[in-house]
Amino acid sequence: MNTSQTAAGNRITFTSQPLPNGTISIAGNPGAVISTAQLPNTTTIKTIQAGIGGQHQGLQQVHHVQQQQQSQQQQQQQQQTQSAGQPLLNSMLPAGVVVGMRQQAPSQQQQKNVPTNPLSRVVINSHMAGVRPQSPSITLSTLNTGQTPALLVKTDNGFQLLRVGTTTGPPTVTQTITNTSNNSNTTSTTNHPTTTQIRLQTVPAAASMTNTTATSNIIVNSVASSGYANSSQPPHLTQLNAQAPQLPQITQIQTIPAQQSQQQQVNNVSSAGGTATAVSSTTAATTTQQGNTKEKCRKFLANLIELSTREPKPVEKNVRTLIQELVNANVEPEEFCDRLERLLNASPQPCLIGFLKKSLPLLRQALYTKELVIEGIKPPPQHVLGLAGLSQQLPKIQAQIRPIGPSQTTTIGQTQVRMITPNALGTPRPTIGHTTISKQPPNIRLPTAPRLVNTGGIRTQIPSLQVPGQANIVQIRGPQHAQLQRTGSVQIRATTRPPNSVPTANKLTAVKVGQTQIKAITPSLHPPSLAAISGGPPPTPTLSVLSTLNSASTTTLPIPSLPTVHLPPEALRAREQMQNSLNHNSNHFDAKLVEIKAPSLHPPHMERINASLTPIGAKTMARPPPAINKAIGKKKRDAMEMDAKLNTSSGGAASAANSFFQQSSMSSMYGDDDINDVAAMGGVNLAEESQRILGCTENIGTQIRSCKDEVFLNLPSLQARIRAITSEAGLDEPSQDVAVLISHACQERLKNIVEKLAVIAEHRIDVIKLDPRYEPAKDVRGQIKFLEELDKAEQKRHEELEREMLLRAAKSRSRVEDPEQAKMKARAKEMQRAEMEELRQRDANLTALQAIGPRKKLKLDGETVSSGAGSSGGGVLSSSGSAPTTLRPRIKRVNLRDMLFYMEQEREFCRSSMLFKTYLK
């Protein structure tokens, strides 16, 4: 009998003596009280022993104790008290649980005097172990010696027999059991013959579906590498294979809530061997299930695309687009199902949404890694994958539990593990140092798509400057071609020619604008746009352009060159005179901000330009842009007209220059002017242009054969016939052009004959009765038909009178035997019999016709045309009096009568023998 003693500090020390067969005795000091408070849990003890090479070799030993504690029994046991000599336990074994162990039978090769290693003990925590008040020990009968060691557990469903294996180990080892429950109780057992590390995780019943426990433990399951063990574990715990250097025995105790105990237990009883084994391969099953799920989703989408190919093209395109949006996570599964039902007119599928939510992440990852391919569907982008794609890129690190000695303690909520990372050769190597894994909120940054930042050029505000009239300072911003390009601001200072300088006469000045390279690229706070230069009189084209750039960068951006402007000397001279008059009138400038819109490739923006405008005098006024002309009052319009007269009085060249620069303003101000005046200002001669347009008609008709000739007849046969005729007459063989001309003549002749026959056939099928221009003069057929109807009516009236007479004679009951009366009765009976026979025959015919089915009578084209035209013609004539539209058949049939009529009308055939032979047919 094994005894136990209670030491100070709530520690129970077990001796190293072996347990007797089938008996576990638990006794305690009367003065010691062991108290634990636990929620109803399901505790699983897993011990995985790795054998060590040497003289002592043993089998793997697996102990599974699965026990479910009921809250009602626990409360009843907590309320019971015991007498003196028995300790008080708040949590004890239920009444129906029996635990027994039996030592392994010695083999035949072993000697009997050699002592065998004792069976490893099963350590039960304080909230599980207890003693019933009346039964201090639990005893089982000894099992048969021929059987393997087993563990018998009694549950609510009956007894269960679990196999137990023994092993050997070094004699001097210390075992530490750390209880990380809410009570923080510690039980130590010394002098155990194996090296064992036990992690106990207690999950409260209230947090059954979450990974957060009361003590926030992180459990790392590890299996020794020297043996293979079958262990049953919940699906949310992952088992990793690690190589232990010393092959220790690792026992893991996991306490799971009572609500999940029924689903996590596996009870199998074998009738032949009497043993039950629990085998689980959660990782392989999960991988297979995920593969099947994403394959089903791929087949579903592929079949959907294949079915959409039978639909019209727009439907097929919409289905493909919808599936691509679903793969790219642009559409939720609910919206996908709704749109798919509307596209294909299908019935709703409520189970499809859940299936898509479960399988779409796996399918997206498989499409991204090219594991699966759907025809016509592109893989999703990387940012759609999220954590799924990140987990594939991160390296997988294996973890090994670091053994903890008796003197070492760990903080609640942390677990010390040793990380094994693969080296360059692929073999795992342990890293130096220790890693503490604690429960912290996840801090993972997902890779997101790069953002495009729209930066334009920084625009510097130029204040109004008081400068002489020879300069215009304008700020210009170049166009932006891409979102990532940065444009800079450019200052262009335009200097005008002095008033006293006069250009050389009879010369054209050519100025090229836009040959400037921008070297400053600075970020902008405004969207890029193009801006016009000024709203006043434009600068003279004979200016030298000077670009002043404020920058420190060396990047160059080319500006598209503008066309060369050519102006006559008279226009330049008039322009300078106008500038001089404006300079004498006023010595100050009014700076204005003009907002204009400039068309560009990008959306138009309102651009403000700080420009120096010309002074406004008493009699002169600058022309506003065309957009403002509509809102100008009458007085301002009169002033502008006076300004225009003053400008045009200086000469024809000055007016031409003004019209060149401000053509849009003048056109909007004066409305639709004479086109000749506008053309004359632009230097266009309308008479010359019209003569050129009319002169191109000379080339029409110069090339006769614009396309290749198509020969109607067979050219070799025709040439052979012509050769035979010319050889008989002793003539030379003609060229090929003669045969081509004969073929064209024959084609034209046949075309004329066919056209005439078509007209004759149309006249033949014409219905003259439907023509409103004709009136019937004689209708002999109608008259004969009317007389026939009169005769039929008279005959019917006589038959009715005779029938009535016969019926009256048949109904008479005179007793006088009259031979005439008898004949009339006989005739009446015969007539009735004939009527009955006729009715019976009619009924039989109707029945037979109904049995055969409806007869479809094919209507001829002529009948359809005549009947349709006749039925519609009466209504049309009666309502509107216009001619009805006669439906002509598209196919024209020409018969022999039409051919005879044609031959009678033609001069070549009217006296030919062919016509008379045709008469005889």
UniProtKB/Swiss-Prot annotation:
Recorded GO CC terms: nucleus; transcription factor TFIID complex
Top-rank taxon: Eukaryota
Any Gene Ontology biological process: transcription initiation at RNA polymerase II promoter
SUPFAM superfamilies, sorted: Histone-fold (SSF47113), TAFH domain-like (SSF158553)
Coiled coil regions in record: none
PROSITE patterns with a match to the protein in the record: TAFH (PS51119)
Subcellular location per the Swiss-Prot or TrEMBL entry: Nucleus
Molecular-function annotations in GO: DNA binding; DNA-binding transcription factor binding; protein heterodimerization activity; TFIIA-class transcription factor complex binding
Keyword tRNA processing: no
Classification via SMART domains: TAFH
Keyword Ribosomal protein tagged: no
Assembly with partners or alone: Belongs to the TFIID complex which is composed of TATA binding protein (Tbp) and a number of TBP-associated factors (TAFs). Interacts with TFIIA-L when in complex with Tbp. Interacts with Taf1, Taf5, Taf11 and Taf12.
Role according to the record: TFIID is a multimeric protein complex that plays a central role in mediating promoter responses to various activators and repressors. May function as a coactivator by serving as a site of protein-protein contact between activators like Sp1 (or btd) and TFIID complex.
Protein name: Transcription initiation factor TFIID subunit 4
Organism expressing this protein natively: Drosophila melanogaster
